[in-house]
Amino acid sequence: MAAPTDTFEFPRTGKTAPNRAVVAAMTNKQSNEDGTLSDEEINWLTRRAEGGFGIVTTAATHVVPEGQGWDGEMGVWGDHQLPGLTRLATGINEHGAISLAQIFHGGMRCPQRLTGVQPVSASINSTG
């Protein structure tokens, strides 16, 4: 059995994490209204890598504007988000850790006040 301090290689990519310690995806609601990362969120996640985690996972990140599930959720759907995402990945990788994004779509739970559109679902659901 592998120890938590053992390296871990992802077979498909060949990337190697320095250890098996993983920051789980946690909702911290620190992103800006347009889905861009705030300095606070970048700093918080980067500090996990600096502290020795081998893999740092982001909070849920919506892949389309209408998939946002709550206030403060980061997005990965627009070019305007790339500078912050690049800064985050670079900061994590500089400490030898691997960065992972938890992709997400809020489905029928997306608040219309955030998305501006009626929520979508894979099946017919009652809204009341």
Describe each PLM feature range.
Residues 1-106:
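N-terminal capping/small domains of soluble enzymes
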Residues 90, 94, 98, 104-128:
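Non-globular sequence segments
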